[in-house]
Regions:
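Acidic, proline/glycine-enriched N-terminal capping motif
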Residues: 1-142
Length: 142
């Protein structure tokens, strides 16, 4: 295993780029909430890498977003959700959690996110919201 980190708190999915016009030129930028969350992931990744260089080989990444069940959910169904038999079918989209995680780990954990050959993304309910990222050496399927 190359890296395993847990970021406590409500996971933040990658926001769509925002656009502004200045002096007749359009400029795209990442929303502030997304930038702050990616900075938190970067700090955790730097600490977990402990001075090691970014990996320059194929990697397998697993991203799991744990979200709190809605308060409006009936108690019985809420318990089922926490046990794992009920899955979250709400927004934000699952892939946006992975985009935020991969962009934050880019050039810190792996040289470039093009080195990710396998990606497992999950969204689950939990009383303790968090995002977990695991990076392992890629499998040789040849």
């Amino acid at each position: 295993m190359i890296l395993s980190i847990t970021i406590p708190g409500v996971p933040v999915a990658k926001g769509r780029p925002k656009f502004t016009a200045r002096g007749g030129f359009a400029r795209a930028y990442t929303p502030a909430k997304t930038q702050r969350y990616e900075d938190v992931i970067r700090c955790e990744a730097v600490a977990a890498m402990a001075g090691r260089d970014p990996v320059d080989e194929a990697v397998t990444v697993s991203v799991t977003a744990y979200v709190v069940p809605p308060k409006s959910m009936p108690k019985k169904r809420r318990l089922e959700a926490i046990e794992g038999s009920v899955k979250p079918l709400t927004r934000p989209d699952l892939d946006n959690y992975a985009k935020a995680a991969l962009d934050a780990c880019n050039a810190i954990v792996f040289r470039d996110d093009s080195l990710v050959t396998d990606l497992l993304i999950r969204k689950r309910y939990s009383e303790h919201p968090r995002l977990t990222i695991t990076v392992e050496a890629g499998e040789d399927y040849a």
